[in-house]
A protein has these predicted regions:
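Mixed-charge, low-complexity intrinsically disordered regions
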Residues: 1-97, 109-118, 122-223
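Conserved positions in beta-strands of structured domains
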Residues: 10, 102-105
Length: 223
């Protein structure tokens, strides 16, 4: 089977560190989906504007491995417990393919690079290859009774973020909210809990440095 890359997504997250662990956790985090030339046909998007959300099937292009392991160590479990790869959304899979549900903000047909999709809530690093786009169907895709296995106790955990507003002056308003949301999701590996350690992530061309102590993330610099 041959799989073609139909598009790439542009986001403000240029490194894996800081990317939300699931889609929808940071609704303010925007993304732009640019189709590859063979697929820049407005007819391919006809009717898409009627859907509020989309499924993106994508490639974990920064997580390719020559061999796969039947078990992985989910970061949310502290990195010291193993789970079956098919019981996780780890990027280290037999086939490096992921699934992300995003909100469709706008479809623009008159962009220079052809039809462009503006989305929000993506959990994808800048430049991620998109393999397919499908509409989210509430009547079929929503299961309120679903359970989340070992992830249920972890889903609501967030950090308090302390940040001087002046540090965010170089970002657009929505980017400020997105960055604060990314930080609140605690980008650190669970096994790292040194209050003296200074962490850094790249966001919208800025180097963001911060510390975490007793559930509070303090932003030191955005430069």
């Amino acid at each position: 089977m041959t799989v073609d890359v139909i598009a790439h997504i542009r986001t403000d997250l240029t490194d894996k560190f800081g990317v939300p662990r699931q889609s929808g956790l940071v609704p303010e985090l925007g993304g732009t989906i640019v189709l590859e030339p063979p697929y820049r046909n407005p007819d391919a998007l006809r009717g898409l504007e009627g859907f509020s959300h989309l499924w993106l099937i994508f490639q974990f292009h920064r997580a390719a491995r020559a061999e796969w392991s039947p078990t992985v160590r989910p970061p949310r479990l502290g990195g010291n417990r193993r789970m079956g790869v098919f019981a996780t959304r780890s990027p280290f899979r037999p086939n490096a393919i992921g699934l992300s549900c995003v909100k469709l903000e706008e479809v623009r047909l008159d962009e220079k690079l052809g039809p462009v999709l503006y989305v929000s809530g993506a959990d994808l690093v800048d430049g991620t290859p998109i393999l397919d786009i499908k509409p989210y169907l509430p009547y079929a895709d929503c299961h309120p009774e679903a359970t989340g296995g070992f992830t249920d106790p972890l889903s609501a955990q967030k950090l308090e973020v302390s940040c001087d507003p002046a540090l965010l002056a170089g970002l657009a308003p929505r980017q400020r909210e997105a960055l604060l949301g990314v930080l609140a999701c605690d980008p650190r590996p669970r096994y790292q809990d040194d209050p003296e350690r200074v962490y850094g992530l790249s966001f919208a061309g800025k180097n963001v440095r911060f510390t975490v102590e007793k559930g509070v993330l303090t932003v030191l610099a955005v430069e």
